[in-house]
Amino acid sequence: MNRRGGQTAFAAIARNERAIAAFIPYSSHLTDTTLITHGADLVRTWRVQGIAFESAEPELVSQRHEQLNGLWRAISCEQVALWIHCIRRKTQAGLDARYENPFCRALDASYNARLNARQAMTNEFYLTLVYRPGHAALGKRAHHGQAEVRRQLLAHVRRMDEIGSLIETTLRSHGEDHEQAITVLGCETDSAGRRYSRTLTLLEFLLTGHWQPVRVPAGPLDAYLGSSRILAGAEMMELRSPTCRRYAQFIDFKEYGTHTEPGMLNALLYEDYEYVITHSFSAVGKRQALAYLQRQRAQLANVQDAAYSQIDDLAHAEDALVNGDFVIGEYHFSMMILGADPRQLRRDVSSAMTRIQERGFLATPVTLALDAAFYAQLPANWAYRPRKAMLTSRNFAGLCSFHNFYGGKRDGNPWGPALSLLSTPSGQPFYFNFHHSGLDEDCRGQMMLGNTRIIGQSGSGKTVLLNFLLCQLQKFRSADADGLTTIFFDKDRGAEICIRALDGQYLRIRDGEPTGFNPLQLPCTDRNVMFLDSLLAMLARAHDSPLTSAQHATLATAVRTVLRMPASLRRMSTLLQNITQATSEQRELVRRLGRWCRDDGAGGTGMLWWVFDNPNDCLDFSRPGNYGIDGTAFLDNAETRTPISMYLLHRMNEAMDGRRFVYLMDEAWKWIDDPAFAEFAGDQQLTIRKKNGLGVFSTQMPSSLLGARVAASLVQQCATEIYLPNPRADRAEYLDGFKCTETEYQLIRSMAEDSHLFLVKQGRQAVVAQLDLSGMDDELAILSGNARNLRCFEQALALTRERDPNDWIAVFHRLRREASAGLR
């Protein structure tokens, strides 16, 4: 062994290493949720979700701030102290999805590779209540037997339960889900009977910088916690574990700003490094607090250039303290920044100090008593708190506002896993779903509302977003035996390339070209017969002139006659041949229907025969799959629009049989301008969830959508709302029509049009999310559906003569690149 001057070569390292048991105050788990320290303090911790501050109204933020101040006032006494931790750490984000379709597999792989290029981060808030029975109680422990000690402990636990109940009641408003907004950390037992403590898991992270489950030990906690070697230098610490080596540096406040407000430290929630912010607050008695304010006022009065306003502020503060508007307590702050590389850590520390100083605080690196700052992170470690300051409960509430981001729901949704993973400006993953359900509820298999509205101006990325979500839906095709059916009511062929890439069927309805529709070939069921009576009566109506009762009877007889024939013989022309012309009313009926028949009964061809008088009915949604219908042409034809709409919707209803079902409408205002679609959309908004389905509506014209007859249903019966950037957004449309808040409206207006950002709103929560597919040119070409790509797509289909996407997609990309290079 190397020795130098009688010391080992590692003596210097050994001197810097701390035996940490002496710095850990905890003795044991008193209950599943409560620890007891060696000094008989009781410790209980909750995880708090926090409020989604990005989209919260200022009034709500102020209200929550006052609620926190009121809570701290209500529980303040010399026996109560609080530790609050904001932990920003790396997290594993991702969704395990299996796609049968090759394009979807490729898209998902490329997209996840892009997401993984930036480390996902998460923010977590933990509130720890420390209850100190006091020295009198400690003396009683020494003079009484175990029974008396146990009785006292139970009394203290009951008092802690009362305080904890008040905390939980107040903080249930600080989260996405009232029931899960605050959850106490307890113990869990695994299938092998091993007990794990979530409280000890948090404490172990504070000591090691590494998140790992911690079992409840049989022995003392101070000898059990802390699996890393801790080496303290002049300004940096090293946390060395068997699996990793991490470095830590601390920041604290040297001077506080002149005022505080909710969310003053929110800028730190967007940073790209890991950290732990620790706040502690222990209220002092009113007499001591008043004496402190009086001393501060006297000191200012003795300074010649002191501002009179500051002295007045302190006088008002004394009055407010006496009135009980706030309490004052000892406060300490620290920020431990973690990293794997010392040089990068120094850069991160510099960034953090800049963010803090921008808000009026003087931040400084901790260089003295570095290990004290480290151990002061542990709740109830009173002796090690550095640089304590006197602070009001209102200021404390401003520094610890529990501001966070809405993260969506990863698992346990009605259809299982989240539909898609979206990035956010903060780096926190957002798990997107059409359905909106309780965050900690397992809602798999439940029929819940999932209707979604997408609002975005032209060029904002609406088509790409719609098609991307359509592709992500394909994971549910193989999820169970029922599969998935999607029907996309398209406009301007924006989804055609994508639907074809999914090996779906796409129907373009164009004036004068046979549609492939033949309603008379429907199975002869009561429901279909009733529908045919209604459809054919509409076809026979002339200029809003209704049919007579005799004409209705004649038509009904002819329908039933034709339905008894073999399917190959059932056509509109056949129907016409089975209407007798003994009366003028019957002859008028034949004349009207003749316009829809290949053989109009007068030796000619009806002008509209191409709509329904086709030899075979090609419309079939009975099998799970993806279907697209382009309405660009027929939606502008007032004469054919409603009959075609009626038939499409009747057939679509057949597909809503309990399988997962989604219908999408691009430029929904144009579709629901037709009475048939309007009635369908209005009714289905209310009932489609009972059939395991949902509708997705998009538009670039909010005014037209809001002016529709079924606008109320389209607005009120949506579980999810998506708003893309729109600097010209009309205030009345967004605030009065869509019921956005002022903050949400300003976010929609302020997002850059090329930022790929959008606002997702579900219930009371909203988040700014992002779908940035930059660099994914091949995938974007299929998702975007612009005019140039459509031309290349048509050429690729003509060259390959194949519907199989594996054949035409490669040719499509080659043609597209040649067109971009000017070779074609």
From Swiss-Prot:
SUPFAM superfamilies: P-loop containing nucleoside triphosphate hydrolases (SSF52540). GO terms for molecular function: ATP binding. It is found in: Cell membrane. It comes from the Bacteria. One of its GO terms (cellular component) is plasma membrane. ATP binds at residues 456-463. Keywords: ATP-binding, Cell membrane, Membrane, Nucleotide-binding. PANTHER family: TYPE IV SECRETION SYSTEM PROTEIN CAGE (PTHR30121:SF12), UNCHARACTERIZED PROTEIN YJGR-RELATED (PTHR30121). Belongs to the TrbE/VirB4 family. This is Type IV secretion system protein PtlC homolog. The gene is ptlC.
